[in-house]
Amino acid sequence: MSDLPQVVDADWLRARLGEPDLVIGDVRGPNAHTRGHISGSRPLVLGSPPPMSDPEVIEELAKEIGLRLRRHGVTGEERLVLYDRGDGVGAMPSAQLAELAGHPRVAVLVGGIAAWPDELDVGAVELEPVKVRLEPRLEALPTRAEVERRLGEPGLVLLDVRTEEEFHARGGYPCDPRQGHIPGAQRIDEEALFDGPGLPKAGAEVRAAVGAHEGAEVIAYCHSGSRSARATLALRAAGYQARNYPGSWHEWSRHAELPLER
């Protein structure tokens, strides 16, 4: 069984096209896939994580994602590489959802289809559903309960990738009942982790910005999980064991019992 990095580039994928244990999933949707896709890929829309992380919600989501994977012919025994239009906003959350459902080997193609140098295939791809049962990994998605339980835990980096104004409660979204940040979080602008849209900076630069050693555990959050999804792509590319907290401040701010700092 071949190893799979958390993030791969076009050269890595080109060298392995056609390998029998490699499945390439296009998360952009079936219409976009039909208009043009990486050779050998299939449409694989898994959706987005929910804004609330109640246990029953996460458990049901894991089952639903497992069903979607089976409908798209994904068994869990393959290496699964996901790509989007190029910014990571679609592929990175989809990767965490596949992990939540129990898929053990999932990667994201950095730069997505925009970075693919070869001619695209066109036309619809026929899917063959499979009958397998994945074992959910509920820990793949950080929840507000996990984040609260682990506040101040040595070795865990809690990374806020919002603006300085949001972090210090000098600005923010009016839909949030409270402003500030999760206690103990450090802040980095999401854009500081990238050289361009969907193109993470070199691993050494990202690690210098984060200030933690390669392999450290990082939970990233923002307002509603989009910026932190992109940040998670850069963090994983830099060698961190990174997860995106999809509920982010949108969820945390709604629970008056949860602490905050300004």
Describe each region flagged by the PLM.
Residues 2-76, 150-216, 254:
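Positively charged, proline/Ser/Thr-rich regional signature most characteristic
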Residues 2, 55-150, 171, 215, ...:
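Thiolate-centered catalytic microenvironments shared by cysteine-dependent enzyme domains
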Residues 219:
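Short aromatic/hydrophobic contact patches that present stacked aromatics
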Residues 175, 238, 255-261:
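Extended, aromatic/histidine-rich regions of cofactor-dependent oxidoreductases associated
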Residues 120, 167, 260:
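Short clusters of hydrophobic/aromatic residues that line enzyme substrate/ligand-binding pockets
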Residues 222:
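Short cysteine clusters
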